[in-house]
Amino acid sequence: TKPSQMLPIFEFCRHIAGERIVPLISVHPDNTMNEVGVLFTRAAEAGIKGVKLHPMYQGFAIDDRKMYPVYQLIEHFGFFVVFHTGYDMAFPGNTQADVERVKTIADQFTDLTIVSTHVGGWRQWDRSGVLGKCRNVYTETSITMTEINDDQFIEALSQFDEDRVLFGSDSPWSDQKEMLERTLCLRIPDRRK
C-alpha cells in the first residue's frame, strides 16, 4: 500500500516461491519507473510470474494513464497482472477498480495477461460479461460464493471460457477448504471444476 513496501514484498515472495506456491510481487504508482524496472528484472531472475495490484489501497484507477508504463513493463517481462476488481467494502462508492476500467486496459494492452478477481468484479457480476469477451482476461473465484447463491455464481462463471477461470479463496477472508468443497459440489461439468 506504499512505495517502501515494494522490496520487502519482493524479498518475501522470493523466499516462499516454490513448485506449489506462486507468490505475486507488487509495485506502487509512486515507485519510479527505474525502481520498477530493477524490481522486475530481479523478479524475472527469481522466477516470479506475476504482479498483484489493488487500486483502492494503492490509490490509482486501473485505467489511469500514469499506470500505462507499469503495464508496458509487466507485458515486456511476460508477467501477468492480478487486479482487485469491483467493489471493496472498505471503500464504498469507489470506482477505481470497476469492470469497465479493466476492459479499457485489456483493450489497450492486448498482450498483457490480466486476472480480474472475484469472478470478474466483486458485486459487479452483472457487468463482468464484458471481460469474458477479452481473450487476455482470466478471472478467479475468490470469496464470491460467500456473497451469491450457486445459480448466480454459475451464471457469472459462464461469462468466461472455462479455460480462463481460476480457483481462488481470498484467504483469510474465506476458508480455502470450504471454498474448494463448495466448488466441487457445484452443478457444473467436472471439467470446469
Language-model features, listed with the residues they occupy:
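Conserved, mostly hydrophobic/aromatic
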Residues: 13, 43, 51, 74, ...
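Active-site gating/metal-coordination segments in enzymes
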Residues: 2-89, 93-96, 133, 147
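Short, surface-exposed alpha-helical segments at coil->helix boundaries
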Residues: 6-11, 99, 125, 177
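Catalytic pocket-lining loop regions of alpha/beta-barrel enzymes
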Residues: 49-50, 63-166
